[in-house]
């Protein structure tokens, strides 16, 4: 198990480094595909991955990245407002097929996954964006390592036993 995790982690790390090194549209398309995968996974958690709400979230993700690629940033806010209104319209028109929970999941899927992941691309295209992205990655790795080491060595108080049984308050503070 460890060997498989190590090899897949090494391959993904090398792939990530290559994509970030190339920058531009390569990074943008990779992040867009990652966003679509994340939206799919979130929608699947709620058993909606093939619903009309999911299709709206997928299309919004693609449209959002296209707006970024073609430097149409001034239209992003109207696009996002239109998306929320469209999701709510589908909810109202198709009720009770789709519930308020379904509509909120579709809205969350775009904003929590696609919008937040897009900042990886947006930072990367800045003048020193490559260095900034690498710095964020390094800081995250250091934080995770310290949290793990402090938690293993000093962890006595469980943070959330049902959700994540091995995490401790000490590990949280160590990271």
Segments predicted by a language model, with ranges:
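Membrane-embedded alpha-helical bundles of polytopic integral membrane proteins
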Residues: 2-162, 166-168, 172-175
């Amino acid at each position: 198990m460890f060997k498989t995790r190590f090899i897949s982690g090494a391959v993904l790390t090398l792939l990530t480094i290559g994509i970030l090194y190339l920058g531009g549209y390569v990074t943008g398309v990779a992040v867009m595909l990652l966003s679509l995968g994340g939206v799919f996974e979130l929608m699947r958690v709620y058993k909606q991955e093939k619903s009309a709400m999911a299709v709206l979230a997928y299309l919004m993700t693609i449209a959002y990245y296209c707006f970024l690629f073609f430097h149409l940033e001034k239209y992003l806010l109207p696009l996002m407002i239109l998306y929320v209104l469209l999701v709510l319209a589908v909810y109202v028109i198709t009720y009770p097929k789709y519930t308020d929970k379904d509509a909120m999941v579709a809205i969350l899927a775009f904003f929590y996954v696609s919008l937040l992941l897009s900042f990886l691309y947006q930072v990367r295209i800045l003048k020193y964006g490559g260095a900034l992205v690498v710095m964020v990655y390094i800081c995250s790795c250091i934080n995770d390592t310290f949290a793990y080491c402090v938690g293993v060595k000093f962890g006595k108080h469980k943070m959330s036993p049902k959700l994540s049984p091995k995490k401790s308050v000490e590990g949280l503070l160590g990271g």
